[in-house]
Amino acid sequence: MGKAVIAIHGGAGAISRAQMSLQQELRYIEALSAIVETGQKMLEAGESALDVVTEAVRLLEECPLFNAGIGAVFTRDETHELDASVMDGNTLKAGAVADVSHLRNPVLAARLVMEQSPHVMMIGEGAENFAFAHGMERVSPEIFSTPLRYEQLLAAREEGATVLDHSGAPLDEKQKMGTVGAVALDLDGNLAAATSTGGMTNKLPGRVGDSPLVGAGCYANNASVAVSCTGTGEVFIRALAAYDIAALMDYGGLSLAEACERVVMEKLPALGGSGGLIAIDHEGNVALPFNTEGMYRAWGYAGDTPTTGIYREKGDTVATQ
């Protein structure tokens, strides 16, 4: 095992230079870079991968640019339903929450489920009451709302569409995927992953995608890899996308790059799925593959300058230390 490393994502989809101003680009790049730098400093200080991914996703939830926490999209009923998961590659313990509306940071609730309950996943009112009982504050769902998200809901209604993220266009492979996530490898060789989302604009209330499902949108195992996904949630669930990366490495003998190529570029498209993922293997190799036009992403080894990206760039999808 080499240097500690962190990678994060803020969603994948039809993200082209023609559609985004330089000012918009800079806002995303600055936000992603700052969060990775925080994670790098934590790793340098010897903090655990689990703490690093939890904090990175919490910060992504606090940033209204991304569809998780503050800035989450609206359901068809003009409500917010948030999902999150976290997994510790050292112990294989995991925690997740789904359909929560009164918790500012769902990833912290997922961490509570993992550490303070005998369960892996809790949903709705029960998950919220559990979090309140363990010290999390009850907040008004209004804190998640932004004018842009509401405009997108109205646009989606007009189109009669369900959309994944903040473009306001119909749900298809051309759209941005509204999920955030983080993966990390710490100085002790432990891996961890976390994923959080506000779901899909104009979705039916009660819909749950891959983000809170261990093995679909999030997975970590010290023996192989940590993965966080973003994309067409229903397809990622059917493909067990996050776990499939680990399985191909464990049982198929594939490298991280080969496993990611198989899942993201072959298996998911065959099922009609668009999106991407971030992954770090137990040796510290990093992969950030996506089959869409772009993916908000950033990564960096402890002590190095963060690398950020939005669009597809030649040679930037896999990095080795």
Annotate the PLM regions.
Residues 1-321:
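Alpha/propeptide regions of enzymes that mature by internal proteolysis
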